[in-house]
């Protein structure tokens, strides 16, 4: 009995740490993207850009809409926990580097280059999201998936609160060149739990179960799949349309 109890405690601690790991990864995506999509609109308005141009700024979110296009490639390349970790870490390092670069630019004079870099940053964060979601699905049992899903929701909405609210106030006080480097550092710090998490384990996928190019087409030909797709589009459009 005494020998089992410490093992149970260690397993519980590992599960909590793993949940915290995924929360950090999800909030690392949400805070910078929420800040950029909100702050750029404010700064562009202050610099007298037209409302039409500001409205087109929403197109920077396109990478997150079409990230399913490169998701099968990530699934094929990632087999072990280390493969997923490597994909997430590289994506976040590039994400942080792009945020730092954006911080050296001026909205008034470099807006189009800034938008280009923001699009690239959302490509990298979208790639991180694909790998993180896959790792979460493979790490947790069916009965525990609701917990990691709650970490995703907390990270997304908490990130929107911090990025679109708190950091906007910080922007007014400290300026663009201070907040963006802070965001880059924040993204790097959010990687630390993943780096030190030794509890992540998955069953390695046999080669025959890896995603193939034909699976992309097969997915959309499943019976009843379009009803689910339409439901999810309307559901998430309603959620994010209010943010």
Language model segments and positions:
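A membrane-interface helix-boundary motif in multi-pass transporters
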Residues: 83-86, 169-186
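Transmembrane alpha-helix termini and helix-breaking/packing motifs in multi-pass membrane transporters
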Residues: 72-77, 103, 160-178
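Glycine-rich segments within core transmembrane alpha-helices of 12-TM secondary carriers
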Residues: 64-67, 146-171
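Juxtamembrane intracellular "pre-TM" segments in multi-pass secondary transporters
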Residues: 2-15, 199-230
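Symmetry-related core transmembrane helices of the 12-TM Major Facilitator Superfamily/SLC fold
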Residues: 90-96, 178-196
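Helix-loop boundary and gating motifs at the non-cytosolic
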Residues: 5-64, 226-227, 231, 236-243
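C-terminal ends and interior cores of transmembrane alpha-helices
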Residues: 89-108
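Cytoplasmic helix-loop-helix junction between adjacent transmembrane helices
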Residues: 121-155
